[in-house]
Design a protein with these regions (language model features):
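NAD(P)H/NAD(P)+-dependent Rossmann-fold oxidoreductase cores
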Residues: 6-129, 179, 183-407, 462-479, ...
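Glycine- and acidic
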Residues: 25, 95-101, 134-141, 168-171, ...
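Acyl-thioester-processing domains in fatty-acid/polyketide/NRPS systems
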Residues: 37, 49, 180-198, 472-738
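Secondary-structure transition/capping motifs at alpha-helix termini
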Residues: 80-81, 119-126, 159-166, 251-255, ...
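Flexible, glycine-rich beta-alpha linker
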Residues: 136-143, 147-186, 264-268, 365-366, ...
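Short acidic (Asp/Glu) and glycine-rich catalytic loops that position anionic groups and cofactors
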Residues: 164-168, 258-259, 267, 294-297, ...
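Hydrophobic pocket-lining residues within nucleotide cofactor-binding pockets
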Residues: 173, 214, 334, 452, ...
Length: 738
């Protein structure tokens, strides 16, 4: 299948619907008690039992790993109590642009080992929420400072990937929210039925956000002209994946590349001369035996790796020279800030200011969350983040044109066994957003790579990935994407590029079940409907009711998308008048399932206190299919103004302003009419419960409007849509004109 290529784009989403959770116990972990009383009051009013734990009560310094902390938690918490939820209230930090928020590192470390330590206290189907206070825009705010706390989103995703039945979610709440509102928003997120959503933000305007992976078919056509005055500083660039990317870059732009690596480029030992890699072990053992010495397995591996690393570095250097580039290899430890500056300074004096940074260094220390240690975190996170911070300090940012960072799909998606690696790579993404905002003259790209073919992915692992539905990046294609993205003149949708699909693989089979959720619909939150009035009363358009039911259906079935719907009926239209209660229920009943699809029946209903039976408003049958996302491209928007189509003036259509989307019809053969449609971009504050809805309700409404026009033409009578027999979804929208 075609390699998925997508950009992380901040997208508005509606407030969460609410499911009815079983009452239980919740543990709130806090560094200060500022919001604690409001949380306790709200939760206890719902019947929950709240326990609290101050982070200050934990002696963090005595713990080397999650297992050690687990023992202290067991001594602090009562008996063998299980919690249905854990809420980690992350300490609020003030980000530092100079230090790239190094102050926040220790609390990420604490959150990591706490998560592993609390596992045995969390109900298998419970939730763990990580709540931070920032801009509410998940780190992409123009005004917010960098906070690495945002990378807790990767921890939340990894929790869910490892503890399959447990839900993990990161919540970024605007720092100015009062405690009552703070508690209310956390409550809403705890009760959100959409368990595939692991990362949300609420800004100061109470708009909710998430990162959407907007897929694109790669089209990098306009290339910058190569010029040899570029000087690139590259970490991890002489070996592996980074080396492949560098060679692709040098092929288009033969520049100067300063390659930083830990390996010392010594002359190859005599015993390894002209020996193939596969025969090195045998040659080394022969050398040791001839000397009458003994070799440990550790020494053997060390010597072989050293020879192989030197060979790979020399191959990279030779290939760069063949491409007319100027490679300079420097042995350096990017974790050593003091030594790094002294190493780089003379190179800058000789070759000129560094104009591009490529940060590809990284290490792994895979193990389960409950086995994670401080040492693991410091090694994995330190190499990625402290290494980047140290590199940044030796550079003159005003001279930079490019910052290209190697991140991982583990950060964007989460990945079992890689919680620290996921956090580090999501921190890279956050730094990319920060640099993108604060250094607009620099092209910043954070490449969230999936697994690459070759290297750590051997044939057996490749087969495993294929069975799980995980795309493996072909070496040539990945390197080409790197180079073309770096050198193209295309306007990038965001600084975070995701290459490959979800590395967690296919979702587990879902057991069909009936479900019920509540939703609040207020005209004040959806003022668009004042432009859809009958008899002076705003009415919920049938197309929007259908889109609401379809989106709710997808929320409950992770990895499934609506394939089609049938038998949609308007039973009693929803009028926004004084009689409306604002509180509604969306109820689902299971119909059938096959290997690839699930069919359910969904209805929107309201209940008046004086009546025992709920009032039925809309009903539809939905077929969901296990489906991979499709490339969309950005929607091509066209200038818009309300249509002057005569049907809006002569009483055929009652729609106003944003609903005036049809234009002149032209009659064609056999009595068929065609219409032009131009869709506006409706402001998000006018359509809060439908913002970001993928089912194009306004386009569907345009289709229903066209039917009303045709009905008037045939019968000379006005009409309203009361049912739709069926509909299928083939592809996402690509334009605002049809």
């Amino acid at each position: 299948s075609q390699l998925e290529l997508g950009w992380a784009v901040l997208t508005p989403i509606p407030p969460p619907h609410q499911i009815f959770r079983q009452v239980g116990s919740v543990l709130v972990v806090h560094n200060d008690a500022h919001h604690l009383s409001a949380i306790k009051e709200l939760w206890e009013s719902k019947g929950f039992k709240i326990d609290s734990l101050s982070m200050k009560k934990i002696d963090w310094h005595q713990h080397e790993d999650a297992m050690s902390l687990k023992e202290e938690l067991n001594s602090i918490l009562e008996g063998n109590q299980l919690f249905q939820g854990v809420i980690w209230l992350h300490p609020m930090m003030i980000g530092s642009k100079e230090e790239l928020d190094s102050d926040g590192d220790i609390w990420l470390q604490h959150a990591l080992i706490f998560s592993g330590a609390i596992k045995n206290r969390l109900d298998t189907e419970g939730s763990i929420l990580y709540v931070a206070q920032g801009s509410g825009n998940l780190g992409s705010s123009e005004n917010g400072s960098l906070q690495v706390a945002q990378s807790l989103s990767a921890l939340a995703k990894t929790v869910q990937a490892e503890w399959v039945a447990t839900h993990g979610r990161f919540i970024d709440l605007h720092k100015d929210f009062e405690s009552v509102k703070f508690a209310e928003l956390v409550w809403q997120e705890l009760n959100d039925p959409n368990l595939s959503r692991n990362q949300v933000g609420w800004d100061q305007n109470l708009q909710r956000w998430e990162y959407e992976r907007v897929l694109h078919i790669p089209q990098f056509t306009q290339q910058e002209l190569p010029f040899s005055s570029r000087v690139w500083l590259v970490s991890g660039g002489a070996k592996g994946v980074t080396s492949a990317c560098l060679l692709a870059l040098a092929k288009q732009s033969p520049d100067t590349f300063i390659l930083l690596g830990r390996t010392a480029l010594a002359e190859e030992p005599a015993w390894a001369s002209e020996v193939y890699d596969k025969d090195l072990k045998e040659a080394f053992l022969k050398e040791i035996t001839n000397k009458g010495e003994k070799a440990t397995p550790k020494l053997i591996n060390q010597m072989i790796k050293q020879v192989q690393a030197s060979r790979e570095i020399n191959r990279t250097i030779q290939k760069l020279k063949e491409l007319r580039a100027t490679p300079i290899y420097v042995q350096a430890n990017i974790s050593d800030q003091s030594g790094l500056g002294g190493t780089i300074k003379p190179i800058i004096e000789q070759h000129g200011e560094i104009t591009g940074l490529i940060h590809g260094a990284g290490v792994l220390a895979d193990r389960k969350l409950e086995q994670k240690s401080i040492k693991d975190f410091d090694l994995v996170y330190g190499t990625k983040i402290n290494g980047l911070r140290n590199l940044w300090k030796v550079l003159d940012s005003s001279k930079l044109s490019h910052v290209l960072l190697f991140s991982s799909g583990a950060g964007f998606f989460g990945n079992p066994g890689q919680s620290d690696y996921a956090i580090a790579n999501e921190a890279i993404n956050q730094i990319a957003w920060d640099l993108h905002k604060n250094h607009p003259h620099v092209k910043v790209v954070s490449y969230n790579w999936g697994p690459w073919d070759g290297g750590m992915v051997d044939e057996n692992l490749k087969k495993l990935f294929q069975q799980r539905g995980v795309q493996v990046i072909p070496r040539g294609e990945g390197a080409k994407i790197f180079a073309e993205t770096a050198l193209s003149n295309n306007q990038l949708p965001s600084p975070v590029l995701v290459v490959g699909n979800d590395i967690r693989g296919k979702d587990l089979p879902i057991s069909p079940k009936n479900w019920e959720e509540s939703i609040t619909l207020k005209l004040v939150d959806n003022t668009l409907f004042t432009e859809h009035s009958i008899g002076g009363v705003p009415v919920l358009p049938a197309a929007y009711a259908l889109a609401l039911l379809l989106r709710s259906s997808e929320d409950h079935y992770q990895g499934y998308k609506v394939q089609k719907f049938q038998n949609f009926k308007v039973l009693q239209g929803l009028r926004f008048d004084e009689q409306i209660s604002n509180c509604f229920t969306i109820k689902s009943s299971f119909v059938s399932e096959s290997n690839e699809t699930i069919q359910i029946s969904v209805a929107l209903q309201s209940s008046e206190k004086k009546k025992s039976l709920p009032k039925q408003h809309y009903h539809v049958e939905v077929v969901l299919a296990a489906s991979a996302p499709q490339p969309t491209g950005q929607i091509v928007a066209h200038p818009w103004e309300p249509s002057l189509f005569e049907a809006y003036e002569n009483g055929t259509l009652f729609h106003e302003n944003y609903f005036k989307v049809l234009s002149t019809s032209s009659n064609v053969k056999n009595g068929i009419s065609s219409f032009d449609v131009n869709l506006p971009e409706v402001p998000i504050e006018k359509i809060k419960n439908w913002v970001g809805n993928q089912f194009a309700p306004l386009l569907l409404d345009a289709g229903l409007q066209a039917m009303l026009v045709k009905g008037r033409e045939l019968t000379k009578l006005p009409s309203l849509p009361l049912s739709i027999d069926s509909g299928s979804f083939l592809a996402p929208l690509r334009s605002s004109k049809y």
